[in-house]
């Protein structure tokens, strides 16, 4: 049985808004009996999340993208997109899970990167290392949403598994909000693999002259149209990025 406990609640000023940062500890009785430590998960909340179905993003930790700004993935841009959009709407939740590398951990993720440098895609690399394609489990995120007493929400995601996890918990998704961000020459293959082999709902993204500048400036609010959950994926648009000085 899973028990969720809030252990901290602080104000977190950001460039977009002052969020409340909640820290949770989850004790799974089965894992506790085996001596495993309690899992932790974070949630950033903003505004009154019960006046209307709030915008919610379930986001997995990515040290390479979010700390070192790696261009191999879209994690950094998706995190900023979610926080900025929540701030623009005035209310919302971002659940931040510690599931680095789709659940295989940082070191194994870097080993997978080595194989990708040799030509394998993200799926082939995981399988070569003996890992599942995606080891993540969203039960902890769902428990956070239940703790926050959310019965309906707008879910920002391109991942059908997150949609299924939320719906299976009996939480209504009134709208899927696209988590598309501009591709770059380093992330194009990765995003195409997510679309074509993992079934992610990656649709076309508008072109910008400089991907690096897109999230460094105050861009216009994204079109949050009434995206259907079964939105068909479309073509990715590559961006030219300036060469780095060495």
Regions found by a protein language model. Name each.
Residues 1-224, 230-246:
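Catalytic domains of riboflavin
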């Amino acid at each position: 049985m899973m028990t969720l406990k809030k252990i901290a609640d602080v104000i977190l000023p950001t460039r977009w808004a002052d969020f409340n940062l909640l820290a949770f500890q989850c004790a799974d009785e089965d894992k506790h009996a085996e001596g495993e430590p309690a899992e932790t998960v974070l949630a950033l909340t903003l505004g009154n999340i019960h006046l209307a179905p709030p915008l919610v993003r379930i986001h997995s930790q990515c040290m390479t993208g979010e700390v070192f700004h790696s261009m191999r993935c879209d994690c950094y841009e998706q995190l900023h997109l979610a926080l900025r959009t929540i701030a623009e709407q005035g209310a919302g939740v971002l659940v931040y899970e510690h599931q680095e590398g789709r659940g295989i951990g940082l070191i194994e993720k870097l080993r997978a990167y080595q194989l990708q440098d040799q030509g394998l895609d993200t799926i082939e690399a995981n399988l070569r290392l003996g890992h599942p394609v995606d080891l993540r489990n969203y039960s902890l995120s769902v428990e956070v949403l239940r703790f926050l007493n959310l019965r309906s929400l707008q879910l920002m995601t391109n991942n059908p598994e997150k949609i299924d996890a939320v719906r299976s918990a009996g939480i209504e998704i009134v709208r899927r909000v696209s988590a598309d961000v501009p591709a770059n020459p380093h992330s194009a293959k990765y995003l195409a693999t997510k679309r074509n082999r993992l079934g992610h709902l990656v649709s076309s993204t508008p072109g910008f002259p400089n991907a690096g500048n897109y999230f460094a400036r105050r861009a216009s609010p994204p079109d949050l149209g009434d995206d259907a959950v079964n939105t068909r994926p479309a073509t990715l648009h590559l961006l030219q990025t300036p060469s780095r000085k060495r």
